[in-house]
């Protein structure tokens, strides 16, 4: 089990960049400045400082530098009274807790921190996994948990192994987008698969060994990750609150007009956010399978700029015309429908090549193809890994420039490439064993970039060489969900467990990791290339907000 010192080295050693690189940069006018310090440590680098104006739906955050100094650009803070908050694991805000910002002047707030009395409450999922005793194979069983809830729900429980097994059985009957506030039961014989009974029992016994079922305190030390350093502190983060706490923005993307569009994982709406005004609009999708769970996942665009939505257990897909603000839907043919029919992902990106939209049916691991012009569906069925005759259970399904399809095999290490003309599948294996490719994108050079969820890495498949290259993330237990490249050739991903946004320079192998102000459960990632530097966007799936990350370089 890695020590805290090892965690520090793994992360800090990769992201530190000399501050002299930025010394010549002109400083923008500031609305609020100050220094963060504690009695024990003096000035503190890498503390996320957040400011939220009274009555506003926006929270602006910056990060303290190596002298403990922080600065909010004047362009980001309007005049008014602001509530202050911090994120620095192991510390709480001592004061001040508010600041008054006036037009044309710079306010000052020197922030004092004190040691926290409840470290466990501050730990990220990644820090919990680093803290747990046991083998990595045992810890990885918990990677299936954090899609629905944080690990502290498990860790602070007093369930014994038998009670965990009972809880698992109940959970298999709930829709993936269920929350404690908005539970949805699956219908009929649809169930989520937990695997063989022996594995379920072993997982239950492991969880009962790390929670509070045996004692009132944990019998292992709690380990923390280091705070950001150097270049990772040069960032401004904006969080836009959504109007209802039950909104789960799963996929968030930005169109050419600067409007953010997002899917609701637990409701049948398409949402939009105008970052300039903070206005949120919701467009209800039609119900096409009454009585079944509602919620949407994948959000993609076609060449004409139309938005396409995967409708999950509603058993179909939808297209939204932004000009007319109307939906068109296509339901999977009745003969292929079951209680478990689930359209989580679709790919219209290059449908202009052959007029076909790829759609995944998670039930039975089927690949479908839709002709929107005629409404006709094809069922290409499930595909096998010929080396072991195992079914490829794809997660993301991005398409290349010729509308050939990639199958990211979430239960193994495979990347399958499906020829759109012949229907033949070629399988490629990532060097990291059981890497569990999840979601990804094809770049301008027709290369596939993808997240290796269990491999804790970014992968890139080059179809010319037919080779896969990998870059392991510097933060242990980051478990990336998705990857996208920007106009500069850098690759971006985010952690479902550590609340860090990772930026990779593939030429040098260097990472920069930006710590977000709150628990975020990062899923789909998007980069807006119209800005310089580029801007990163993500939906806070468990936090009912949209997050914008603006690096200063």
Q: Could you describe each region identified by the protein language model?
A:
Residues 35-44, 77:
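Structural motif
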Residues 100-125:
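Extracellular beta-sheet/turn segments enriched in Thr/Pro/Gly and aliphatic residues
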């Amino acid at each position: 089990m890695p020590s805290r010192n090892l965690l520090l080295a793994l992360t800090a050693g990769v992201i530190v960049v000399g501050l002299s690189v930025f010394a010549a940069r002109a400083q923008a006018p500031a609305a609020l400045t100050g220094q963060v310090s504690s009695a024990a440590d003096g000035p503190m680098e890498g503390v996320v400082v957040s400011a939220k104006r009274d009555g506003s739906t926006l929270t602006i955050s910056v990060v303290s530098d190596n002298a403990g100094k922080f600065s909010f650009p004047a362009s980001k803070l309007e005049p008014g009274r602001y509530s202050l908050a911090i994120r620095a694991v192991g510390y709480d805000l001592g004061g001040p807790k508010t600041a008054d910002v006036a037009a044309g002047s710079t306010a000052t707030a020197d922030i004092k921190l004190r040691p926290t009395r409840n470290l466990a409450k501050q730990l990220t999922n990644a820090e919990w996994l680093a803290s747990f005793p046991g083998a990595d194979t045992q810890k990885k069983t918990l990677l299936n948990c954090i899609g629905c809830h944080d690990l502290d729900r498990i860790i602070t429980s007093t369930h014994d192994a038998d009670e965990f097994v009972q809880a698992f059985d109940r959970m298999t009957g709930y829709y993936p987008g269920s929350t404690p506030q908005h539970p949805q039961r699956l219908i009929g014989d649809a169930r989520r698969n937990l695997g063989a009974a022996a594995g379920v029992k072993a997982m239950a016994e492991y969880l009962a060994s790390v929670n509070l079922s045996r004692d009132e305190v944990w019998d292992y030390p709690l380990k923390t990750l280091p705070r950001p350093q150097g270049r990772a502190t040069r960032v401004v983060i904006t969080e836009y609150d959504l109007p209802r706490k039950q909104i789960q923005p799963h996929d968030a993307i930005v169109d050419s007009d600067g409007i953010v569009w997002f899917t609701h994982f637990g409701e049948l709406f398409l949402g939009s956010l105008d970052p300039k005004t903070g206005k949120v609009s919701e467009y209800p999708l039609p119900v096409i399978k009454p009585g079944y769970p509602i919620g949407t996942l994948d959000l993609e665009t076609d060449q004409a700029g139309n938005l396409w939505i995967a409708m999950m257990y509603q058993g179909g897909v939808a297209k939204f015309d932004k000009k007319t603000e109307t939906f068109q839907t296509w339901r999977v043919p009745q003969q292929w429908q079951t209680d478990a029919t689930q359209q989580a992902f679709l790919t219209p990106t290059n449908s202009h090549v052959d007029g076909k939209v790829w759609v995944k049916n998670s039930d039975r691991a089927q690949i479908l193809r839709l002709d929107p012009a005629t409404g006709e569906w094809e069922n290409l069925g499930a595909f096998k890994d010929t080396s072991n005759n195992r079914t490829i259970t794809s997660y993301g399904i991005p398409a290349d420039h010729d509308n050939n399809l990639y199958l990211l095999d979430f239960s193994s290490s495979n990347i399958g490439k499906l020829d759109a003309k012949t229907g033949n599948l070629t399988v490629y294996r990532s060097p990291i064993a059981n890497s569990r490719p999840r979601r990804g994108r094809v770049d301008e050079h027709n290369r596939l970039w993808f997240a290796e969820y269990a491999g804790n890495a970014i992968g890139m498949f080059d179809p010319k060489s037919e080779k896969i290259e990998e870059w392991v993330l510097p933060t242990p237990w980051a478990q990336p969900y998705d990857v996208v490249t920007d106009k500069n050739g850098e690759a971006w991903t985010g952690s479902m467990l550590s609340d860090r946004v990772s930026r990779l320079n593939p030429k040098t192998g260097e990472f920069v990791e930006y710590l977000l102000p709150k628990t975020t459960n990062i899923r789909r990632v998007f980069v807006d290339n119209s800005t310089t530097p580029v801007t990163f966007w993500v939906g806070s799936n468990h936090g009912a907000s949209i997050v914008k990350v603006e690096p200063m370089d």
